[in-house]
Amino acid sequence: GTAPQELARQRARYCAALEQFELYFGPGRQVQVYSAPGRAELGGNHTDHQHGYGLAAAVTLDLVAVAARNTDGYVRVKSRGFNKLDVIDLATAEPQEGESTHSASLIRGIAEGFRTAGKAIGGFDAYTASDVLRGSGLSSSAAFEMGMACIWNGEYACGLDARAQAGISHYAQYTYYVKPSAQLDQLAS
């Protein structure tokens, strides 16, 4: 669409995400808005996790997260289009049985990655709305992972650069989600 049409669409999208956050987590909270893009592989598809080269670029489709810190040691994430509210107790660091291949495993793994990096983190509540559709080939999982990493990095002033956040996100995907991969997707997101 035209620039004014796209601006109106994005404004409505962000406002809807804020409204949904308030619906699930209550009004009047101090929130921040985070964005993590999907990615397109321009060359070397699947060669990156075979120790080869790949080329990727971020795309304009992204995951938007409205988030606020909490003090109870839990992470709660509600994602548009999914019926489940992910609730993760940060006191439990190790991978949980039955959790791999679910978003909760990524959140738990990213938390452990931040702790391993020596960063003090805590809980948060978040609502996510993603235009990076599952199965689209644009790495919705990397957008989700990087969105979660951005929330911890921002809410808890961790000071990690994008490359370090990508490394943590990759660790979570490989170790907790149990999906062998390289860092191409996370680095592009």
Spans of model-derived segments:
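ATP-binding N-lobe of GHMP and related small-molecule kinases
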Residues: 1-142, 146-162, 168, 172-177, ...
